[in-house]
Amino acid sequence: MEDHYGYMSIKNMPMSERPREKLLSFGSQSLSNAELLAIILSTGTKDRTAIDLARSILNTSTEGLRGLKDCTIEELSQVKGVGLAKASQIIAAVELGKRISLTTKVNNYKIKGPDDVSNLLMEEMRYLNKEIFNILLLTTKHDIIAIENISVGSLNASIVHPREVFNRAIKRSSSAIILAHNHPSGDPNPSGEDINITKRLIEAGNIIGISVLDHIIIGDGVYFSMKEHKLI
């Protein structure tokens, strides 16, 4: 229904201009970022179409679409017309995109040194506002089997337990692992706790027969390799 102020719902748009119909007829590549986001949102509000709402969301960051990568539910909910349900839909879609991207990178990816780990994880981890501790599970030839998250939050011995780390490695028949976590401050230099946890995991790995090859700390565009710095 069109009102006196020019508002038109998506249902009253020509079929060829409706996001879902465009996708079905011409493929997802034919849609703009706002149209793709509108499909995820599904509905707009009583006075704004889903496309209008999508444009408002994309305009909340100077980075546009890329800005959604780090948005929180709280930030998205500040956009007029976006409640917890719509914010959750967006966060879920973004997370799926991240996981697909990482899975694509991981396939047949061989680790020859710390640069390879940095190239794989830097863009994903450098802007995180919480510490994330991951392990890279490797074959005997150092091809990546998987990357698994162990903990979220400040790194300490109580949340990074050898049992949890090596249980993942054993389940995936991993011969070796590399530890990786980020420093939200941007400074990748290790803390005493970082070093102690690493040594503890190396000792456990030696007993089990799974080598801990390195511990990479991701900063803002820089990384620290404990192996390179002879800390392990």
Swiss-Prot record:
Cystine links in this protein are none
Q: Which residues bind Zn(2+)?
A: 181, 183, 194
**CDD domains in the record, alphabetically?**
MPN_DUF2466 (cd08071)
Listed under GO biological process in this entry are:
proteolysis
* MPN domain ranges (all copies): 110-232
Concerning SUPFAM superfamilies, the annotation shows: RuvA domain 2-like (SSF47781)
List keywords of the entry alphabetically.
Hydrolase, Metal-binding, Metalloprotease, Protease, Zinc
Q: Which GO terms describe its molecular function?
A: metal ion binding; metallopeptidase activity
Q: Where is this motif: JAMM motif?
A: 181-194
Q: Which PANTHER family match?
A: DNA REPAIR PROTEIN RADC, UPF0758 PROTEIN YEES-RELATED
Q: Which family does it belong to?
A: Belongs to the UPF0758 family.
Q: What is this protein called?
A: UPF0758 protein Clos_1766
